[in-house]
Amino acid sequence: AMSSISMSDEIIYRKIVKDTITIPAHSFILGTTIEYIELPDNITAFVEGRSSIGRMGLFIQNAGWVDPGFKGKVTLELYNANSLPIVLEKNRRICQFVFCFMDDHADTPYVGKYQGQNDTVGSRVFKDTESNKRSKKRQ
């Protein structure tokens, strides 16, 4: 039997807590920073992978900027572009935060669907306000 997923369905991710994790070749996983950050409304941040890790074939993203006012651990999207598995050990430095001071305070600091996250959080795109507006128009 086939099933389909619409953007209104939440995907349940399997949580893995181990001292090491093997990312198979050409595979994607979600991870979480150890650090819990609280950004004031005049500082933004983004995450950059470390060069040594990138040279192993591990791509690290965090879906863009960490918004001013964000509080929580940052979810990372990790992709192994290598043809071999990559083993990551707990507490290994794989990325770094870059903090940017803004010229002024944010008009609307972050209070979104990921605020206060303490763990790896899957996509909550189904909670996007523009998606909800489109769904209501169709009804």
Language-model regions, residue ranges each:
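DUTPase catalytic domain/fold
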Residues: 1-139
